[in-house]
């Protein structure tokens, strides 16, 4: 059991039959009242994100998540196909479990697969990934108050805003958490 005061980003726990991973956690205490803990969590089975509130001192059951390194092979249209790097076993994960992650996946990429008691839940990507720019319109510098940005399309068909100097064919770093441009690769 984990005390909710110990919940922080990355911790996994079970509650009401669901398995959650903490994305953000904030603690607040008002006057003489009891402390409250608000956590933004992702349900690893459905992929949905919600905010849960707990009163200080509550306990939740820890979920023991097994992580396995795998290679992304291809998208079959209904699921993504991954292969274990050691046993060469192939598994499929339905697309609705990895909608956001699909924006950053390219063939041969290494990912971490999260499993709970042999049930495949979802995949975990590195914080930043390197992707190639396939379409970058020429931007015209205008009268801008802040840094000018333009929309470019990446090799995964994901569209991201970048500075004007990014050109077609360049490789850039993109955050997998926010989907924003981080820098040149």
From Swiss-Prot:
The keyword Cell division does not apply. GO terms for molecular function: translation elongation factor activity. Pfam families: EFP, EFP_N, Elong-fact-P_C. Keywords: Cytoplasm, Elongation factor, Protein biosynthesis. CDD domains: S1_EF-P_repeat_1 (cd04470). Gene3D superfamilies: 2.30.30.30, Nucleic acid-binding proteins. GO terms for biological process: peptide biosynthetic process. It is found in: Cytoplasm. One of its GO terms (cellular component) is cytoplasm. It comes from the Bacteria. Pathway: Protein biosynthesis; polypeptide chain elongation. Belongs to the elongation factor P family. NCBIfam families: efp (TIGR00038), PRK00529.1 (NF001810). Involved in peptide bond synthesis. Stimulates efficient translation and peptide-bond synthesis on native or reconstituted 70S ribosomes in vitro. Probably functions indirectly by altering the affinity of the ribosome for aminoacyl-tRNA, thus increasing their reactivity as acceptors for peptidyl transferase. HAMAP family: EF_P (MF_00141). This is Elongation factor P. The gene is efp.
């Amino acid at each position: 059991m984990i005390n909710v005061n110990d919940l922080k980003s990355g911790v996994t726990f079970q509650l009401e039959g669901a398995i959650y991973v903490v994305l953000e956690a904030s603690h607040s205490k008002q006057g003489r009242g009891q402390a409250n803990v608000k956590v933004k969590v992702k349900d690893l089975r459905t992929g949905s994100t919600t905010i849960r509130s707990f009163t200080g001192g509550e306990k939740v059951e820890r979920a023991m998540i097994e992580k396995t390194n795998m290679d992304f092979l291809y998208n079959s249209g209904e699921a993504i196909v991954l292969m274990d790097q050691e046993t060469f076993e192939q598994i499929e994960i339905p697309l609705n479990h990895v909608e956001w992650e699909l924006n950053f996946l390219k063939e041969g990429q290494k990912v971490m697969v999260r499993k709970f008691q042999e049930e495949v839940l979802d995949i975990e990507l590195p914080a930043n990934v390197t992707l190639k720019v396939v379409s970058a319109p020429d931007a015209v510098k205008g009268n801008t108050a802040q840094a000018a940005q333009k929309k470019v399309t990446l090799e995964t068909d994901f569209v991201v805003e970048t500075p004007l100097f990014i050109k077609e064919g360049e490789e850039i770093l993109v955050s997998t958490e926010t989907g924003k441009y981080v820098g040149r690769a």
